[in-house]
């Protein structure tokens, strides 16, 4: 058989091992894995490189339509491709209107036409005002529903995202359980975090340490514990977003051991930044839950290596620079990070701490694809989409603002020495990013809908 593409001599991350092996691609799919596979129209030599499944980033905010001046599909998905992401799962908030019904998700589909460099799946929102319309988003094909039990949304904008109270969460979870959809939750205690934040601001306590103190670990743990119990009673599968504390992870582990269907994610910034660095970097490193101290970070690494965290995600949530001006308590909370998930974590987890390549592949791609039912994604295996990223190990560079593809070229990682590089990203058999050529093809990304899987 003649193939479209053969990738030769790379160290390939397979599901349970990593070895030097060749990959054949035909019609955008992985056709064969082995040696001496035959002829191909194109042969790529990956000698000295790690060939990983393309990252499945299960937590990305693209603010188009309505707030494309924050981040748009064109810039956001180019940055993703440059960072080795081939599929993103897009959050239902930051854009206007929020993605809470059929009409709003159709606006997103229209806004993205001709702009997607990578593939994208969608999450619907569970908010205080759409519980009777959740079925609309399920019918369209979202792969899950996101909600906040922390305060969110601009109360001055009618169609912005909104948090839910316990009753709304419970009723929504019941309906999502009936639909077979997971609920994803931002877990912080709204009343306590809001009160502590207002108290700090009124007393002039506005440093990074003050911000972290206003959102203490117990506010995350309490919220996780609460939604675990409510989701269990409601009969709904649960996914905890961006866990920032080992104590929070322990709640998920305990629930799993008791038989509950629950998964969780965390983000690179909780593993490579700490509160002291947050103080130095300033508002660009503000997010919620916050970046905590070094002892907390050490505990998170332990949980990651123990296999208690299912996947790593960017939680890419940028904004215009003026919204990061002023003191930390007043600035927008969100990190621009999707371009540097894979290289930073390959350096920190694999090269510096000895994580196995198969575990890295699961954390960056396989587990997220499985959790959200993306059956063609997340694995280098025959029949799957030919989505790959080439990683050059032990190749250091210093990240600059000019390296970034975001709408606004800022990131808390600027100035960081990163010890690995993404050299090529391939989506369904086509190179969508190359370190020498840039972006050699027109945007070819597609939306992935649940019922098409």
Curated annotation (Swiss-Prot):
GO CC terms, sorted: cytoplasm
EC number: 3.5.2.5
Domain of life where this protein originates: Bacteria
Gene Ontology biological-process annotations: allantoin catabolic process; purine nucleobase catabolic process
Needed co-factor(s): Zn(2+)
Catalytic activity: (S)-allantoin + H2O = allantoate + H(+)
One GO molecular-function entry: cobalt ion binding
Modifications the protein undergoes after translation, according to the UniProt entry: Carboxylation allows a single lysine to coordinate two zinc ions.
This protein's pathway: Nitrogen metabolism; (S)-allantoin degradation; allantoate from (S)-allantoin: step 1/1
Chain positions recorded as Zn(2+) 1 binding sites: 59, 61, 146, 315
Entry keyword set: Hydrolase, Metal-binding, Purine metabolism, Zinc
EC class (word): hydrolase
Chain positions with N6-carboxylysine modification: 146
Signal peptide annotation: none
CDD domains attached to this UniProt entry: L-HYD_ALN
Pfam families listed in its UniProt record: Amidohydro_1 (PF01979)
Binding site for Zn(2+) 2: 146, 186, 242
Record note on cofactor: Binds 2 Zn(2+) ions per subunit.
Family: Belongs to the metallo-dependent hydrolases superfamily. Allantoinase family.
Subunit structure of this chain's protein: Homotetramer.
Function: Catalyzes the conversion of allantoin (5-ureidohydantoin) to allantoic acid by hydrolytic cleavage of the five-member hydantoin ring.
Protein name: Allantoinase
Organism per entry: Escherichia coli O17:K52:H18 (strain UMN026 / ExPEC)
Lineage of origin: Bacteria, Pseudomonadati, Pseudomonadota, Gammaproteobacteria, Enterobacterales
Gene: allB
